[in-house]
């Protein structure tokens, strides 16, 4: 029995693995590739060039791979690449890239993108991230592994969201968020570190204590960023987790959320 509903529309150039499921009224456009075990629900629109990996699930009314609304976009060929084991819930929108940046929007593996979230053009989402309902990423946003963006979080273009970071509900992020940091508010302010997330992921208590001290160095001692980075040199050499925190600050191009 075919796993493609007869009411779905599949472009002849689309490439689907044999066990891909496509629900009624969904449209799989030209240049779309879908890997094995992926399930496309009803009323989904997929536009290419888009490559979707293995064992993903995309729910109804999502629009994946559509043209970017960026006014610089003039119809150039750009792409969207989605990895494996992602869940994309109802009404999600994900746009392809632009030639002015990297020509590609990327979603990694094992991510949960919840209802009505938006991923803008040229954004790069890592692995094991959660974008909760109505979270919206502008163009060129980078989200590192294990980050969690709570409902209605808004992220300004070109911001970098560090690994294992966490945003509270309704947060408006306009600057980079360092790794492990918890932010909340409009505009976003750093409140603490995502210690609960670290414990759930098996971080040692020594590493957590080292990160707690590193956070206080950056946020509680009245130091400039350069002064704080100098203070972090020794603990970063001892704890790789502190090095990740330090490096996420050092590489910031928009300034960090304070």
From Swiss-Prot:
It is found in: Cytoplasm. Pathway: Glycolipid biosynthesis; lipid IV(A) biosynthesis; lipid IV(A) from (3R)-3-hydroxytetradecanoyl-[acyl-carrier-protein] and UDP-N-acetyl-alpha-D-glucosamine: step 1/6. CDD domains: LbH_UDP-GlcNAc_AT. Its EC number is 2.3.1.129. It catalyses: a (3R)-hydroxyacyl-[ACP] + UDP-N-acetyl-alpha-D-glucosamine = a UDP-3-O-[(3R)-3-hydroxyacyl]-N-acetyl-alpha-D-glucosamine + holo-[ACP]. The keyword Acyltransferase applies. Its main location: cytoplasm. GO terms for biological process: lipid A biosynthetic process. One of its GO terms (molecular function) is acyl-[acyl-carrier-protein]-UDP-N-acetylglucosamine O-acyltransferase activity. One of its GO terms (cellular component) is cytoplasm. It comes from the Bacteria. Keywords: Acyltransferase, Cytoplasm, Lipid A biosynthesis, Lipid biosynthesis, Lipid metabolism, Repeat, Transferase. The keyword Lipid biosynthesis applies. Pfam families: Acetyltransf_11 (PF13720), Hexapep (PF00132). Involved in the biosynthesis of lipid A, a phosphorylated glycolipid that anchors the lipopolysaccharide to the outer membrane of the cell. Homotrimer. Belongs to the transferase hexapeptide repeat family. LpxA subfamily. NCBIfam families: lipid_A_lpxA, PRK05289.1. This is Acyl-[acyl-carrier-protein]--UDP-N-acetylglucosamine O-acyltransferase. It comes from Pseudomonas fluorescens (strain ATCC BAA-477 / NRRL B-23932 / Pf-5).
């Amino acid at each position: 029995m075919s796993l493609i509903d007869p009411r779905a529309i599949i472009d002849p150039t689309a490439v689907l693995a044999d066990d891909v499921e496509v629900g009624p009224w969904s449209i799989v456009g030209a240049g779309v590739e879908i890997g094995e075990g992926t399930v496309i629900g009803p009323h989904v629109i997929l536009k290419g060039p888009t490559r979707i990996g293995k064992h993903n699930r995309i729910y109804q009314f999502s629009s994946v791979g559509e043209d970017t609304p960026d006014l610089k976009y003039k119809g150039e060929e750009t792409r969207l690449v989605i990895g494996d084991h992602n869940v994309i819930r109802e009404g999600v929108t994900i746009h392809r890239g632009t030639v002015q940046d990297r020509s590609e929007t990327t979603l990694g593996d094992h991510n949960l993108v919840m209802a009505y979230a938006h991923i803008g053009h040229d954004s790069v989402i890592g692995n094991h991230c959660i974008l909760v309902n109505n979270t919206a990423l502008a163009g060129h946003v980078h989200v590192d592994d294990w980050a969690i963006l709570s409902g209605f979080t808004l992220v300004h273009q070109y911001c970098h969201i560090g690994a294992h970071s966490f945003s509270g509900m309704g947060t408006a992020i306009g600057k980079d968020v360092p790794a492990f940091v918890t932010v909340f508010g409009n505009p976003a302010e750093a409140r603490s570190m995502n210690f609960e997330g670290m414990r759930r992921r098996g971080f040692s208590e020594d590493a957590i204590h080292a990160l707690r001290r590193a956070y206080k160095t950056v946020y509680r001692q009245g130091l400039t960023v350069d002064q704080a980075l100098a203070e972090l040199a020794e603990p970063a050499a001892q704890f790789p987790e502190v090095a990740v925190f330090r490096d996420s600050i050092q590489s910031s191009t928009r300034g960090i959320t304070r």
